[in-house]
Amino acid sequence: MATLRVDEIHKILRERIEQYNRKVGIENIGRVVQVGDGIARIIGLGEIMSGELVEFAEGTRGIALNLESKNVGIVLMGDGLMIQEGSFVKATGRIAQIPVSEAYLGRVVNALAKPIDGKGEIIASESRLIESPAPSIISRRSVYEPLQTGLIAIDSMIPIGRGQRELIIGDRQTGKTAVATDTILNQKGQGVICVYVAIGQRASSVAQVVTTFHEEGAMEYTIVVAEMADSPATLQYLAPYTGAALAEYFMYRERHTLIIYDDLSKQAQAYRQMSLLLRRPPGREAYPGDVFYLHSRLLERAAKLNSLLGEGSMTALPIVETQSGDVSAYIPTNVISITDGQIFLSADLFNAGIRPAINVGISVSRVGSAAQIKAMKQVAGKSKLELAQFAELQAFAQFASALDKTSQNQLARGRRLRELLKQSQANPLPVEEQIATIYTGTRGYLDSLEIEQVNKFLDELRKHLKDTKPQFQEIISSSKTFTEQAEILLKEAIQEQLERFSLQ
């Protein structure tokens, strides 16, 4: 039997003592006293911050929202079905953050930035707080670059600039998502990173949007953040902030970004659900008192940065759903007051076959012509006024028995102008073709055509102009001005097309 000598024992003991590393860890731990409906109440978490992440024994995470004298109200970032009364909860000491990187482009993720498209993990070396402060006044500059949507009605009369917040508002099934997705499709080749945030949508609707992006080649510059209708309210509430954090990552890297929130009504409803379950006092329409702050802190993150920060931008297009066209409800009025204008989609126009169903009369962009190229200003300057006068005259004509020749001509011109604003879905037009289209309508070249022929004529004109007068596109894209030479080329193309069209 082998025996250890005293000096060997001494040596082993010395080595063990030297290797001993005394770690004292202090953890903030509490116990669950109540759980259900996506809410947990915890006792014992004495030194916890508002918004701090907590971790339950079975792995579910949550966010501390209510800090009360006797307990802490936690909203769960999962179903929480395995959480038991009396189980331990650990405060992490961290605020919610997500990984960010270029690798997110082309992917579909959830509100925690975890991939849900089955294409494997996303490698990211950096992270950003989900809720970051908005850029300060000094960090910004005024909006001056156009963000082309590809929709004639918007780019000519309700222009959107890079760094602007423009609300898309309307009843359900009026084409709000179509306007937003067409805008994303039109950013192809423009160097704009797009983020589409789907909040509380049907999974089939989100799948349809993602399929459209794949088919049109838009997914390579787009990130989709999706929380479906069956997701916990906490994740539906977080999804827009996650999208904003991903867009900010690119904005601060001197890139231009576009973010769509589809839609903020669902986020407000999720927040209302959480607040009522946490027993916060309800206000108007049962929303909590800070529902304005919910949206203002999100939308203020959209900005055009100054030259010191690289002139990146984040353009936000929030969507809000109205009930029976009531824009005076709580959430619509809140978001209208936060944004730099609104695009109002009308159910009546949609049902009348005018699509996109944009009501140009009450839609407005508070940035205005600062976000238009000079050529568009020159050609489309008076078109909004002409359409407004047409709508007024049309209402009057319903009661008048006989109209004079001038009024009849004005009505005929107005009908053709309204016709040229029609566009099929997923068919955005480049700005040069939009200018040619508007010029043709406002200068009276469509007056001799039947209304049913207008769009066919314009489609053929745009093709003819592209094939026979490529210089027109070069002049507009290089000088951004509607020069005399461009006008001569366009007039020639219109006359040639009118002659060809009359022979058909």
UniProtKB/Swiss-Prot annotation:
Keywords: ATP synthesis, ATP-binding, CF(1), Chloroplast, Hydrogen ion transport, Ion transport, Membrane, Nucleotide-binding, Plastid, Thylakoid, Translocase, Transport. ATP binds at residues 170-177. It catalyses: ATP + H2O + 4 H(+)(in) = ADP + phosphate + 5 H(+)(out). Its main location: plastid. GO terms for biological process: proton motive force-driven ATP synthesis. Its EC number is 7.1.2.2. One of its GO terms (cellular component) is chloroplast thylakoid membrane. Pfam families: ATP-synt_ab, ATP-synt_ab_C, ATP-synt_ab_N. This is ATP synthase subunit alpha, chloroplastic. It comes from Triticum aestivum (Wheat).
